[in-house]
Design a protein with these regions (language model features):
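Structural microenvironment flanking redox-active thiols in thiol-disulfide oxidoreductases
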Residues: 52-92, 106-112
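Non-catalytic, surface beta->alpha helical segment in thiol-disulfide oxidoreductase systems
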Residues: 118-121, 127-151
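Short active-site neighborhood of thiol/selenol oxidoreductases, capturing the structured segment around
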Residues: 29-58, 74-76
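Short, internal strand/loop/helix patches
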Residues: 20, 88-123, 127
């Protein structure tokens, strides 16, 4: 039952649940504060092999870099766990253009705002934070953005 309830959250076509995050500088932000046409929410753990592969795939996707440059896409990378020293150690692996934050209050995990059964997880959201793609691989996100004629 709990599994099903979690799967019901943040479905495609629904508004993604808001949460707050903290940057390495201590500055705070929230998902809903992102102003770009698209927000790519990337929930990940430092040092996880699949996370590193996803970072590389996103870094090497021309459409993603182009939209980042045009300020039409925000990549919001969020660390949902407690090991902040570990997170800080890996910060330099993320592109500077991304917003790299952590969930200081562990709300994502404790309130089960997002399904974290698989890490990393990617959500593509539109300007209104409606979920366009959920749990999608980087390639699917790239193809979606290209298909939308966002070149």
């Amino acid at each position: 039952k709990a599994r099903r309830e979690l799967a019901q959250k943040n479905r495609i076509g629904t508004k993604a649940l808001n949460f707050n995050y903290t940057l390495a500088s201590g500055a705070q932000g929230s998902l809903y504060q992102q102003k770009s046409d698209y927000t790519l929410l990337f929930i990940n753990n430092p040092g996880c092999h699949a996370c590193t592969e996803t970072i590389e795939a996103l870094k090497n996707a021309p459409i993603i870099n182009q939209l980042l440059e045009q300020k039409r896409l925000t990549v919001l990378s969020i660390y949902p766990d407690e090991e902040l020293d570990e997170w800080r150690k890996h910060l330099n692996e993320f592109p500077k253009e991304w917003v790299n934050g952590y969930d200081k209050t562990f709300a994502i995990k404790e309130q089960q705002l997002y399904d974290l059964k698989a890490i990393p997880t990617l959500y593509l959201l539109n300007k209104d934070k409606t979920v366009l793609l959920k749990d999608a691989p980087a390639q699917t996100i790239e193809e979606y953005l290209l298909m939308k004629g966002e070149q």
